[in-house]
Amino acid sequence: MGCAINDGTFLVQHRDHGIFQAWNNPYFSNKEINDLYNEDLTFIMSANCQTGDFSYGNGDDDCFAERFLRDENGAVTVVAASQVSYSYVNDTYVWGFFDYLWNDFMPNYGSNDIDFKYPAFANGYGKYFLKQSSWPYLSIHKDLTYNLFHYFGDAYLQLN
C-alpha cells in the first residue's frame, strides 16, 4: 500500500476491517503513514470501522484519518467512518459515492454527468443513494451510516 501511495496513486479506496489506527488487510497503520515520502498527496476513501474517529487518542496519538491529514506526505483528503460501520450498508454508500464522481460507475443508474467532481459532495450523495436504495433493508443500520462517514478536507476540492 505504501509503495502505491509513494508512486503517486491518485485515489486509495480500502474496504475491509479497520480500527482506530490501521487497516487490517492488507495491514497499513499510522506507522506506515509516518514512513510515506510521496509528494503527490492521495485521496483516501476508507470504508472501514473507526478509522475516522477524531476523538481517539491524545496528543500525537492520532486516529488513522487524522494521521493521513497531518503527515506532510499523507493525504489531501480522507473519507472515513467515526465508529463501527456495517457491511453491505457501507458498500451501498460507497457505490453512491463513486457514482457521483464517475457517472458510469453504475451504468444503469442515473444519467446526469456533471463537470465538477467534489468528493465532499460525493459524501452527501452516497448517503442519499443509500437512503433511496431498497437494499440493504435494515433501516437502523442505514440511519447509523448517515452520521457515520465523514469527509475530512477542503469541501471545495475538485477532482479533475
Residue ranges of predicted features:
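Active-site-proximal C-terminal subdomain of hydrolase catalytic domains
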Residues: 52-160
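Catalytic-core segments of thiol-dependent peptidases
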Residues: 1-58
